Design a protein with these regions (language model features):
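Acidic, proline/glycine-rich low-complexity intrinsically disordered segments
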Residues: 1-169
């Protein structure tokens, strides 16, 4: 090992909403290389967000940070923020998918309302129509099939596809 500072590299770029994510990916890839790790299997690059809209991405990150609760009010707050992200960018496939996952969670853990389950599937299908091979979206579909439809056999092939593309699988 050397005493060279790993984080001394300068990233001098013009920042705009259009270039911000590319610079973030470049920095993360440099850190990954310095650590000798790959952040995404097969590509060696950080997975890019599926939006170039900074406001939508900020909302997405806020929702993602608060996701994971099984408490009805918490899930509903997360759903509301994902809805804002999708409203800010109606083509933001990953936000649509995560919205679908949270609606599935609302159904499974709390309401058992078919309207929540069915809306979840609509968002997941919209997301997959935009990015059919996105591994996180395939994982979300598997979770929906498993918890929302009790289609355990249908969930397995989706999990297999997701596993091939998700980091750490």
């Amino acid at each position: 090992a050397t005493d060279r500072h790993l984080w001394a590299e300068t990233f001098d770029r013009d920042l705009s909403p259009e270039t911000l994510f590319a610079v973030q990916s470049e920095i993360a890839a440099a850190i990954s290389t310095a650590l000798g790790r790959e952040l995404v299997a097969d590509s060696g690059q950080v997975a890019a967000p599926t939006t170039s809209n900074a406001a939508a991405y900020d909302l997405f990150l806020r929702a993602r940070a608060q996701a994971g609760s099984r408490v009805d009010a918490d899930i509903r707050r997360t759903i509301a923020v994902y809805r804002q992200a999708v409203a800010a960018d109606p083509e933001f496939a990953l936000a649509m998918g995560e919205l679908g996952l949270e609606l599935t969670n609302l159904y499974w853990f709390n309401t058992r309302a078919a309207t929540d389950r069915d809306e979840a599937r609509l968002w997941i299908d919209r997301a997959l129509a935009l990015q059919p091979e996105h591994p996180r979206l395939r994982y979300i579909l598997a979770r929906h099939l498993y918890h929302g439809r009790l289609d355990y056999e249908g969930a397995l092939p989706e999990l297999a596809v997701a596993e091939q593309g998700l980091p750490g699988s």
